[in-house]
Amino acid sequence: MIAAQWKIIGNSTYIKKEIYSMSWDVDLKQQVSVGSPFAGPIAVMRDSSKFVEMNSQNMKPYLKIFTASGDLISQMIWDSSKNIVAMDWIEKERLVIVLQNATVLIFNVFCEQMTQFSLGDIVREEEILECKIWSDGIVVLTSASQLYSVPSINDFFVESGRVIRLPPLPEEPKARPEWAILEPQFSLSQSIEIFMSINGTLYLIDEDKVESQLEATEPIQKMVVSPCGKKLACFDTKGTLLILKTDGSTTNPDRMDTKATKSPVLKWCGSDGVMMYWDSIKDPILFYFSKGDSWAKFTLDQPVSLVTEIDGLRIISDTTSEFFHKVSDVTIDIFKIGTTSPASILYDATDHFISKSPQADESIRSINDQLEDAVNDCILAAGFEFNGGEQSKLLKAASFGKCFLENYNPSQFVTMCRSLRVLNAVRHHEIGIPLSIKQYYHIGIEELIDRLISRRKHLLAWRICDYLKIKSDVVLNHWACTKVRTDIPDQELGKIIIKKLESVPGISFANIASAAYLAGRSKLATKLLEYEPKAAEQVPPLIKMGESGLALNKAIESGDTDLVYLVLLAMQRSLPLADFLELTFSKVVALDLLISMCKQKNDFPLLREIYHIKDQSKEMGNIYLQEALSSHPSQLDQRIKAYNKSIEHYHHSKDKDDQATSKFIDDQIKLEMLQKELETNLQDESFVGISINDTIYKLITMNQPKKAQSIRSEFKVPDKRFWWIKIKALSIMNDWEELMKFSKEKKSPIGYEPFVEVCLDQKNQIEALKYIPKITDILPKIQFYIQIGYFREAADIAFKEKNFDLLNLISRKCTNNEILNIIEQMKSQIRR
């Protein structure tokens, strides 16, 4: 009877049930063992601090990983020179081992090293005093009384991991401080927080600050945070267990005086209570404490290893694995001795129905109003059971009860049946994942599938996916990636993988091909990539495998120019130039894109090579010209050489425009040589490379009018352009006298408006007034007068021209009343 196994502790009911008879041959008394939560594997290693009788089995130190049922998953010989300071599991069932030299090693369940990193030279030099590992990080305390934190181990898998130095301790510890970690998901700061007992005071330390939490009367020897993150169990030097709140709101903590002189192993049982374990005495004992007077003692006949779960505690010994947890309310309602709950009556009614007793009908009638609740309770109770027979009885009771209900929604019943079928499959001794229903709902089906495939239980994972009607591509992908590391011949293995996966949607053949290539199976990898439907996934592995031609074909077929560019860049880096160009010239699209890429990157040598092969003189000329213009002005010899090469290729072209271009380049050579001469004579290195206009302008501003005139004559600069350049330069120099002289040399070919404009640009209205009268066009002359505020002069011109519209324009701009009156008089006279 189920209730016979229960133990009443305070106001709650608990049960310690055997889940497995362990398959291993392990003496936990001589081993260090750590179990992964959520029914995870157990890592075992010989305890180097204990004397062990040597035999053939333990001559060498081994790291062994077992399932929760004690089946060996993997093992490896451990290098005894690597001194371990901490070993524990993090999420995704990864085993973390921290060494004394500050090296961190990460292993999967097959003892395969996934990655490693260092905590840094400073940590190594200060020496690790103590280290604690949490679900995604590490915290170490050094001999220098300094804390260091790894906020995320997963970040080291993507090379973005970091080690943080935490604030210094608030006082020098007189003895080694005890501490516990509050994980980020439970802290207000959303980063790790550390509870540390130093000299009788409890402090809270985060990445930025240290705060005092509690003035304790006795130093704390052990402390541990509950799975929910809300409670902190502390065991002090007087043998008292205290339960505090992590938010600092504790006023009257729950306590238990054990009178023990030695500190126990402290482990939470879910978040309900704390299990204390003393293994250093003749008969190991467990003490469970919840609150008030709620406690219980369990005497053991062998050492155990404890693993905290969110809803209980795994108690692992040399021979058994037990699960200690609180009995659910629905289970108590159904199986408690003397119970008359509706669910209990329904459960009994089912037995009566099976035995064809008329009492079944009476029982159903008696709970008719509460039948739906009874059905739901039986469904829930089935979920809490590990025994398949008891699950079946409870589900039969629920099924029997719902037959008498109209419009009952069976979704809860169906979901529970499916969940239990999955759970029973993974709980099987050969699989060894004894998840409770609460743990299963907490991690979710995706995480469970991930755990199965990481243990290479692909068939079971696939069957679960198929049963639950969820995507199985992840399972099959991992199966194939594992398969390529076997010794099956390439051709045979290729057929096996393709036959199995070809029709499965969402499969990434690229991932499998990459795994095959890493396993040294290039031919198999190439064959598998032919079945990858996505070109973006297909091309990069082909490049990595050196299949440049195939990669180029696939990239071109995809129509994705970015992919083609990717292949071209990879080919350029890895192939000899001749092979690269031969392969590229065989594909017109690739060649066009290569030319475009070279132009964007100004890769002139490669462009010259391409155009030389294509015998395109004009393009060769363009490249040499572009190369000359883009080279630095100080490299004149190089520029001239490129100009001459350009002319040489343009001469081979039959295009008349190219012949004209040759003449322009000749002039450019002549100009740059003159500019170089100017740089030498004037000791100014900023001439070469600028235009003719800029050269003349610069010479004028440097008071070199004769040299400017010489350049003008040499290159036949038109009068209009020269006048524009000179008046601009003289105005910038504020050489108004020279500007006036220049305006009188001869009639201006550009008129006198530019003279006014440059004066006004320099905000010199007085000089501008000298040139406005010389303007012949009436409108610009009036506009300039308006611009500088000479409204009367503007009005006189408009009146002289008898232009009524211009007078109106002036009056709109003018604000002087006297002048406005004059303008009105002028307008009156014009009207007459």
Curated annotation (Swiss-Prot):
GO terms for molecular function: actin binding. Pfam families: Vps16_C (PF04840), Vps16_N (PF04841). One of its GO terms (biological process) is vesicle-mediated transport. One of its GO terms (cellular component) is endosome membrane. It is a peripheral membrane protein. The keyword Hydrolase does not apply. It comes from the Eukaryota. Signal peptide: none annotated. Its main location: membrane. It is found in: Endosome membrane. Keywords: Endosome, Membrane, Protein transport, Transport. InterPro entries: VPS16, Vps16_C, Vps16_C_sf, Vps16_N, WD40_repeat_dom_sf. Belongs to the VPS16 family. May play a role in vesicle-mediated protein trafficking to endosomal/lysosomal compartments and in membrane docking/fusion reactions. PANTHER family: VACUOLAR PROTEIN SORTING VPS16, VACUOLAR PROTEIN SORTING-ASSOCIATED PROTEIN 16 HOMOLOG. This is Vacuolar protein sorting-associated protein 16 homolog. It comes from Dictyostelium discoideum.
